[in-house]
Regions:
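Short, charged/polar, Gly/Pro-enriched secondary-structure boundary elements
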Residues: 67-71, 137-140
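A cross-kingdom feature marking solvent-exposed beta-strand/loop segments within repeated
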Residues: 80-83
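Vicinal oxygen chelate
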Residues: 1-17, 47-50, 58-61, 96, ...
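Short glycine-enriched loop/turn motifs at secondary-structure junctions
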Residues: 17-20, 86-91, 123-124
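Core segments of cupin and vicinal oxygen chelate
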Residues: 18-19, 25-70, 110
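Hydrophobic adenine-recognition pocket in adenosine-nucleotide-binding enzymes
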Residues: 24, 94
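Hydrophobic pocket-lining residues within nucleotide cofactor-binding pockets
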Residues: 31, 91, 101
Length: 146
């Protein structure tokens, strides 16, 4: 069976037309700092938060709208994690559409956010982008949205 035939069979079997992207999870060392970053600086809402004492971790979900119709970010805080996480080279970034990348970067820089790639056009295309970092060093691409 070819890759195309396999993909078609899986779609027919699984009913992928009803699938939906729910969330992406990132591990954070300081949950309070991460919540402050994502809610106060990026304007997301804390949708839910729950401690799991037997597992010694907390899950907090943040996003721009209700989980029933929006993709959100799951922040996982492992209580015993003292050292920074190794972000490795496989994970790329999260991306946010913003109305004005330049203004957003000015506001975030004034709040002390790291901006490893300042606002400007992409080198090989017309989109205006920037990259910022959250408190754990995860990169977030800001993309100029219409």
């Amino acid at each position: 069976m070819t890759m195309t035939e396999t993909a078609a069979a899986v779609k027919a079997i699984a009913g992928t037309d009803k699938f939906r992207f729910l969330h992406t999870m990132i591990r954070v060392r300081d949950l309070d700092a991460s919540l402050q970053f994502y809610t106060d600086l990026l304007g997301m809402k804390l949708l839910r938060k729950r401690d799991y004492p037997s597992g010694k971790f907390t899950l907090a979900f943040v996003g721009y709208g209700d989980e029933s119709s929006n993709t959100v970010i799951e922040l996982t805080h492992n209580w015993s994690q003292a050292e920074p996480y190794n972000l490795g080279s496989a994970f790329g970034h999260l991306a946010l559409g913003v109305p004005d990348v330049y203004e957003t970067c000015e506001r975030l820089a004034a709040a002390g956010v790291k901006i490893p790639r300042p606002a400007g056009p992409m080198a090989h295309g017309g989109s205006v982008i920037a990259f910022i970092e959250d408190p754990d060093g995860y990169r977030i691409e800001l993309v100029q949205s219409p």
